[in-house]
């Protein structure tokens, strides 16, 4: 995690320096002086989704727990929370109406807007990131092309013994020589298309499957329902002290503060996941080299 933080801060500072440059040629010259690892770290920095999955899961969990506390206070524990008889009698009905309104507003918002993102600031930032990524891709292609041309004419070719190497052996060798672009390019160029495709699949991001997400949300919902029943005193065989109401209030305030912090962070621009940042950038570089080799091969066949 410490290394990821260091790499992320370095990449963030480089991106900040690039933003200060007004001339595109100055940006091109600056990027061309960077090595491929730094360029791929920048590319990964600009390529991350505006709302990473970890952020969405965290928000979903926080929202479930804040719903739990609201339901416990205003619906189930209303008579114990509010000493005023009028408030304790009216709060369950008000909470029920509030819940129905929230459901209706959410449904109408989804119907009207769908998945469209019309935010002008978000559009400008995404277009800027697309432009930076295209520039980085062009520079990387140029660098790989130069490395390919500099590889000796009598370059190493795959022998029969190497052809029999399984995927694990090839992968281990690739990870060993991954820091040297020229050596990596020369070695991968001796592999066939099937092996390169397997390597690219390995270095690609594992998709977060729908069943996995559903299982997490299902387990989270069960925990929230159980906690709501427990804190509200609905489980007869477990005696809950009165102090748990104050504990529930503390949980509510803590979650509310966390949600406000997340909203403020999201308004500042694109969110980034620091965890495994260095590894994800390195895997992106591997995929870039493989894409370059495959593209060159296919271009020769098409021409």
UniProtKB/Swiss-Prot annotation:
Q: Where in the cell is it found?
A: Cell membrane
Highest taxon listed in the record's lineage: Bacteria
Keyword Heme on this protein?
A: no
User: Keyword set for this entry?
Assistant: Cell membrane, Membrane, Transmembrane, Transmembrane helix
- Give the main location: membrane
Would the keyword Cell membrane be found if you checked this record's keyword annotation? yes
- A GO cellular-component term linked to this record: plasma membrane
Its membrane topology, per UniProt? Multi-pass membrane protein
Q: Which residues cross the membrane?
A: 55-77, 92-111, 208-230, 240-257
Q: What name does this protein carry? A: Uncharacterized protein YbfF
Q: Which organism is it from?
A: Bacillus subtilis (strain 168)
UniProt lists the gene as: ybfF
């Amino acid at each position: 995690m410490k290394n990821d933080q260091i790499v992320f801060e370095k990449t963030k500072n480089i991106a900040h320096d690039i933003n200060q440059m007004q001339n595109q040629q100055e940006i091109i010259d600056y990027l061309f002086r960077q090595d491929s690892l730094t360029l791929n770290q920048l590319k990964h920095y600009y390529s991350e989704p505006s709302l990473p999955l970890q952020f969405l899961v965290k928000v979903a969990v926080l929202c479930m727990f804040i719903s739990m506390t609201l339901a416990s206070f205003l619906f189930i524990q209303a008579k114990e929370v509010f000493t005023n008889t009028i408030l304790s009698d009216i709060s369950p009905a008000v909470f029920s109406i509030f819940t129905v309104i929230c459901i209706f507003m959410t449904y109408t918002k989804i119907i009207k807007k769908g998945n469209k993102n019309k935010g002008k600031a978000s559009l400008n930032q995404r277009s800027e990131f697309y432009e930076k990524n295209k520039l980085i891709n062009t520079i990387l292609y140029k660098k790989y092309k130069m490395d390919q041309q500099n590889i000796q004419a009598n370059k190493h070719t795959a022998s029969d013994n190497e052809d029999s190497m399984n995927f694990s052996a090839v992968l281990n060798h690739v990870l060993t020589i991954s820091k040297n672009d020229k050596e990596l390019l020369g070695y991968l160029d001796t592999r066939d298309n099937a092996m390169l495709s397997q390597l690219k699949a390995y270095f690609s991001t594992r998709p977060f499957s729908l069943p996995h997400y559903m299982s997490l949300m299902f387990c989270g919902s069960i925990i929230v329902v159980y906690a709501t029943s427990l804190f509200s005193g609905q489980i007869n065989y477990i005696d809950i002290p009165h102090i748990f109401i104050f504990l529930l209030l503390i949980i509510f305030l803590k979650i509310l503060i966390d949600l406000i912090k997340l909203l403020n962070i999201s308004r500042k621009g694109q969110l980034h996941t620091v965890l495994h940042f260095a590894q994800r950038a390195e895997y992106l570089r591997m995929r870039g080299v493989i894409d370059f080799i495959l593209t060159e091969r296919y271009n020769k066949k098409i021409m």
